[in-house]
Amino acid sequence: MRQAQKAMEPAFDQTTERIDSKPMRIDILTLFPEMCDTVLRESIIGRARERGLVELNCRNIRDYTLDKHNRVDDTPYGGGMGMVMQTQPIYDCFQALCGEVGRKPHFIYLSPQGKVLTQNRVRELAEYENLALLCGHYEGVDERVIEELVDE
């Protein structure tokens, strides 16, 4: 069964080897980093990490809150229904990432309104040396994050 599954997967050597020796760096900004760690060790992503093709890091947005309860949610700026992720912890997490990387990575907010992830889109994203992926929660993120930080 495993051999049949492996035969169906695309070969890394033919389609995804990076030309430069530096691995692509992807940082995931999330409220649930423990979920990321488990998933990123498996399958194609896990093998890419083992081969040094990609460096994946999960950042806990709660680590950047300023209150003792590590609160990340608030009512939407300007009013509205539900709760959204606050600007401050996301901003501080992203600034720490920029300082660590030495530049602003291409920043993508993952949401139902975003682009569909196709093979062609993956090829486009592979051109970036650094990607940061923001995982939303609640009713989404404060609109100021999208306007000020997010590239897509």
Can you describe what each PLM-predicted range is?
Residues Q86-H137, D142-E143:
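S-adenosyl-L-methionine/SAH cofactor-binding core of RNA-modifying enzymes
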Residues R2-A4, E9-V101:
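N-terminal nucleotide/polyanion-binding subdomain common to many enzyme families
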